[in-house]
Amino acid sequence: MAFFSIFKQGQIYLNTWPLEAKLGIIFPENRIMKATSFAQKFMPFVAVFAILWQQFYAKNDLMAFSIAILTALFALLIPFQGLYWLGKRANTPLENQSAVWFYDICERLKQLHEPLPFVQEKPTYQHLAEVLKKAQSKLERAFWQEI
């Protein structure tokens, strides 16, 4: 998989995974996704603030400017760390227990005649996210209590 396609897959996974409280107990995705979304929104402002702060208070200090640039770069790279993790996670095959759970949810959705994602070999976390998204919209709330 190409380096930049991992980031794109991470963004797709971020947008697909349902942020249900019950899922947060089982999977780390909820915490990672909230942190990544927060970083995508606010880290560009932190980067700009770091440079502007340096320009206001230490205008002619090259060492302070280089530290401000490094701080800005670090702030801008934080969302990419989350997207990279999510992209890798999306393409990871499910563990055995999660795969059993995946097929159980698929059976429930098949009973409602819902189209399901095509799975060639072993389902991945992206497939699980797609099925959970459908389950969130098509199955009753009691489903989330059973988890």
UniProtKB/Swiss-Prot annotation:
Subcellular localization(s) per the UniProt record: Cell inner membrane
Primary site of residence: membrane
NCBIfam families registered for this protein in UniProt: PRK01816.1
Species whose genome carries this gene: Haemophilus influenzae (strain ATCC 51907 / DSM 11121 / KW20 / Rd)
Residue ranges crossing the lipid bilayer per the database entry: 38-58, 67-87
Origin superkingdom: Bacteria
Protein known as: UPF0208 membrane protein HI_1205
UniProt xrefs under InterPro entries: UPF0208
Family from the record: Belongs to the UPF0208 family.
Pfam families linked to this entry: DUF412
Membrane topology: Multi-pass membrane protein
